[in-house]
Structures are given as C-alpha cells and as structure tokens.
Amino acid sequence: MKKISGFFKAIGRYFKNFGVAFAKGDIWVKLSAVIMGAGYFARKQIVNGLIMLIVEAAFVLMCVGYAAPNLAKFGTLGTVKFEQVFDPLTMQTTTNNYDNSFQILLNSVVALFIILIFVLFYIHNIKTVYKLQQMKENGEHINTFKEDMKSLFNEKFHITLLTLPTIGVVIMNILILIAVAFTNYDQQHLPPNSLFTWVGFKNFASLFSNSMTVTFGYSFRKVLGWTLVWAVMATFTTFIGGILLAKAINSKTTKLPKMWRTLFIISIAVPQFVTLLLVRNFFADSGIVNTICSNIGITDMLKHAGLVGEHLTYIPFLTDPHWAKVMIILINIWVGVPYQMLIATGVLMNIPTDQIESAKIDGATNFQVFWKITMPYILFIQGPALITDFVKNINNFNVIYLLTQDVFVTQNQALANSHAKEVDLLVTWLFRLTNEYYDYKMASVIGIIVFIICAAFTLISFSRMISGDKEEEYQ
C-alpha cells in the first residue's frame, strides 16, 4: 500500500511542480505556455527552441488533420455502413464512403495517446524552462544542445533505450486490447462489411456469469484453474528435474558425465515443434505407443484398474481430459528439463565449495547440504528466472496447442459453447476465439485477464525477491 500511495503522491508532486513553475516563472516561462520554444530562445538554446516549435506545430496539424476527424466518430465508432451499388449506365459497381469501425478505433486511440504524450511533454517543457531560469539566476552552467544529446547516451541512456519499446510494444498494444474489450467486435460485426460499437462492461459480465446460451463464466473458471495448475506444475517440475539431473550428471560417481550432458543438449537442438508433433503421433489413439501397450497387455490392465473405459481399445493419452493433462505435464518435463539442467549446471559449479566442506565436517548429510546450502543458493541466483518461467508457462502456447490441436475434442457442451476445451490455457483459448471464431471482444477480455495475472504476479514476486543486500551471504 505504501508503494501505491507513493505512486499517487509522485503524480501529485509532478503537477504541483508544474503549477509552481508557471506561477513563479518569468515572462519567458509564461510565454512558453503559448509558444513552446520561447523560453529556450531566451536562454540561447536555439536548437532546443526550434525543436519545441516544430513539435508544437506538428501537434496542431495532427489535431486538425488526424485527431479531430477520428475523435468525432469515436463515440459511435462509425454510422455509415459498407454498401456497393451497381450503376447500369457505367456498368460498374461503386462503393460508398463507408466507416471502418476498427480504423476509427485504432486511429482514435493513437490520437488520444499522442495527445497524452504531448500534454506530458508540454508540462515538462514549462518545468524545464523554469529550471533554466533558475540556473541562469544562480550563475550555473546551462547545457548546450550537444551536451544534452550526449546525456541521452550516458546518464539518461535508460530513457533513450526504453522509450520506443515501451510505446510501441507495451502501451499501444495494451490500449488497443482494452478498447476492443468494451466493444461488440466479433464475427457478426466484422469491418469493413459491418460496424461494431461500444457495449460497456457487457463482455466482462459475460466472462463472470452463466446462462443457458452463454457459458463463458463456466468456461473461464475451468480454463483459469487448469492454467494456474499447469503453470505451477510445468515450472516446478522442470526446475526441480533440471537441478536433480544436473546433480546426478555432476556427481563423482557418475561415469562419462560429458556424454550424458551431450545427449541431453542434443535434445535441445531439435526444434520444439518437431519434438511435440512427433510425440503427439507417438501417443495418438492409433499410435505406436498404444500399439505396444495393447500387444503387451497394458491396455487391458488399465481397463481392469478402471483407468481406461471398457468400450475403448486404446489408452486415450491425448483424447481424454484427465489423461491428456497428465501427459502434457510429463511431455513438458521431457522438453523442459534439459534447458534447466544446463542452467543448474552453471549454478552448481559456482557454489562455494568451502561452505559444503564445512557442513560435511560438521556432520551434515548429503540431503541437508542440498536443502540448506545448495537450494538457497540456486533460488537466490535463479529466482528471477523462475518468476519469468512461471509467467512464460501461463502463456505457453506451443506445448498445449501442438499436442492437442486436431486431436482433443471436448465432450463438455458448456465448454464447447464458448469454444473452449478442458486442456486449453487462457492463451490457447484466446487464440482459438480470434483465429477460428473471430470473437475479438471476448479474446480481448481474456487477454486483459492474462495481463493482470502476469503483471500482478511478477510485481509482487519481484518486490519480495531476495534483495541485493543479502548478496554477501552467497559470496
């Protein structure tokens, strides 16, 4: 809570400082509120002043020629439908000047974002000009344009490096995603032939409620539950498996450790989608594994144990919900453990040997050494990577999709009504909604939920992660 309150206090101070700068500034500061480059010209920063004038002029032109026409239609997202009329005189088909709802939405969001950036830029301009006034009054050195540019690649390089990726990849994608979630953009409202419009929180209500025809609420709970179970199991099974495999290979009693390590590295060299497609064929209902199991009596044994239906002549490795979930986790272990083994090998080779030797002299068993020394050290080093792996597994599209697409067919009608499956993650459900059913509105809502889950987990985990002040314990 302190960090949240501190965030809002920082915003308050930002605008307060702007008011102070404008109130206490000289005539050039106040003139900069109208002509943005005026304050820079007065302090002999000609290039900066020209840049400000160009930015201001470009913003005015953008507002008139780009923002205003689109924002005028932003409230309705268009009213003129697409129509084609055949002209018997010219024997040609003409198209009317129709509205494209998605283009209006996209252009409006971009325009609003540019306006927001300009407002922040405008405030920064006033505060900077006031700071230049104070520096001149105090006889301090005022940077030249060349010195300002150098600072962008030195002490301010982090701002230079992160600005464009943040705007282009994170902010714009998220803003469009959020906007679409409040519309009825789906297969019945596909531009340019149809228009879509705002529906408020109706899509969010659908995701958290049920009816006879709309079962998104039921499907969301089922898919979310499996997504979290999958993320936890996939992360920790490969993590622990990689550590145990690395310790086994690096053990003094293991013969030919280089050979074993090389064999597992070779499995990494094979493209993952090739491995997954081959494994899917191996475990298919008529695949080689089922053939072997049937011939040696394993299928009949599982029938007697009640693990396979009496009417089946095969083991439904990837076609039964329960079997499929177990197999997906096991196959992911096979795919993911070699990666973790390599990482764990590097960490294990850097554990201080004096700590381990001291513990053994004091009578510690191998398990105690592993649990009290090795694991804390590995968690300290790999903690951030473990968080990243968990988030990556929430969005792990390849494993689920390649193993179950065109193989697994849900028998749950409520899930089928929402185009979901028992083995779907939120991300594969989202993909199916957009790629196969063009239900962009619900896909956007699910995308927002995924983003909130990943962002919240990442922020909370990193805030509680082992901080740098404990680094000396592991040196």
Language model features by range: what are they?
Residues 38-54, 152-163, 261-264:
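Alpha-helical transmembrane segments and their helix-start/interface "positive-inside/aromatic belt" motifs
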Residues 2-31, 47, 52-156, 176:
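Transmembrane helix recognition focused on a "late"/terminal membrane span
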Residues 70-73, 159-475:
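A structural signal for multi-pass alpha-helical bundles of membrane permease subunits
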Residues 32-37:
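Hydrophobic, membrane-inserted alpha-helices
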Residues 39, 49, 63, 136-142, ...:
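Glycine-centered flexibility motif
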Residues 26, 44, 338-340:
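Positively charged, hydrophobic/aromatic-enriched amphipathic segments
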